[in-house]
């Protein structure tokens, strides 16, 4: 299911996340982050299965300092859910099980 998530950056964060008509889960990650890599397969599955209910975006913190600083990201992975242009949920740490991710998302949107 690769390709169910999409990348966002400092340049398109407002358009793709804050102005989205559906909720967006943003995975703030780093290429060197082991827990981020461990969570990636579950995130892809959830993105595919929840398509139409929530979009799943990935933001590389090392490549996008503006958004990273704006939301005070200090540990990876950090997951945030945005709805209607506002952050409605945040979780620091990996959720490697698909059901854990789905339950957290469903409870937040």
Each model region followed by its residue ranges:
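N-terminal targeting signals for export/organelle localization
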Residues: 1-5, 109
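A short beta-strand-turn-helix
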Residues: 5-24, 65
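Conserved Rossmann-like nucleotide-binding pocket used by diverse enzymes
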Residues: 9, 29, 55-57
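Short pre-active-site segment immediately N-terminal to redox-active cysteine/selenocysteine motifs
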Residues: 21-22, 29-32, 75
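Hydrophobic beta-strand anchors of alpha/beta hydrolase catalytic cores
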Residues: 25-26, 56, 79
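Typically the conserved alpha-helix immediately C-terminal to a functionally engaged Cys/Sec
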Residues: 35-51
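Structural microenvironment flanking redox-active thiols in thiol-disulfide oxidoreductases
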Residues: 61-68
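Non-catalytic, surface beta->alpha helical segment in thiol-disulfide oxidoreductase systems
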Residues: 75, 80-109
């Amino acid at each position: 299911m690769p390709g169910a998530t999409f990348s966002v950056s400092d340049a398109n964060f407002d358009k793709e996340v804050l102005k989205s008509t559906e909720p967006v889960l943003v995975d703030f990650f780093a290429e060197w982050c082991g827990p981020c890599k461990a969570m990636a397969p579950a995130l892809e599955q959830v993105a595919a299965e929840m398509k139409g209910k929530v979009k799943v975006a990935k933001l590389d913190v090392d490549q996008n300092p503006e958004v990273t600083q704006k939301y005070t990201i200090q540990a990876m992975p950090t997951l945030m859910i945005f709805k209607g242009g506002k952050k409605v949920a945040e979780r620091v740490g990996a959720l490697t099980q698909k059901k854990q991710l789905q339950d957290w998302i469903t409870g937040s949107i």
